[in-house]
């Protein structure tokens, strides 16, 4: 199955929390899987790497929880990101989408089954916003 696409907005210094809901059915039964959420720099180096073994990503039957702590987001360097632009992130419950200007990184969300099958579930762009406070 091809990966779905979804973009995210991440504010440096803020906790990043998202819940990804999966389509009902046997493919959503991933509680026993392992997973990773990796945000990549333009040179393919990792800006953020979360795994089910370390922390930051939790797989459930039917949904995935992602959390990047404020300490981790505060340590993100945008020095290797050359692209900037506007990111639009969908909102829940038919609300208007969110948008922000920032540096553009990319990410992949992958899971691995108990039999070793690796599947990329989501890919997209992460808009990294340095500060929303004018100083």
What would you call each of these model-derived segments?
Residues 1-135:
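N-terminal assembly/attachment segments of tailed bacteriophage virion structural proteins
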């Amino acid at each position: 199955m091809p990966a779905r696409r979804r973009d995210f907005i991440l504010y440096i210094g803020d906790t990043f929390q998202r819940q990804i809901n999966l389509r009902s059915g046997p493919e959503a039964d991933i509680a026993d899987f392992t997973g990773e959420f990796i945000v990549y720099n333009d040179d393919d180096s990792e800006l953020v790497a979360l795994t089910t073994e370390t922390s930051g990503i939790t797989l459930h039957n039917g949904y995935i929880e992602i959390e990047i702590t404020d300490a981790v987001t505060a340590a993100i360097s945008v020095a290797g990101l050359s692209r900037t632009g506007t990111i639009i992130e969908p909102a829940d419950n038919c609300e208007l989408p969110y948008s922000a200007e920032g540096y553009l990184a990319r990410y992949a969300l992958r899971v691995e089954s108990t039999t070793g099958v690796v599947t990329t579930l989501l890919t997209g762009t992460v808009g990294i916003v340095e500060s929303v406070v004018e100083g």
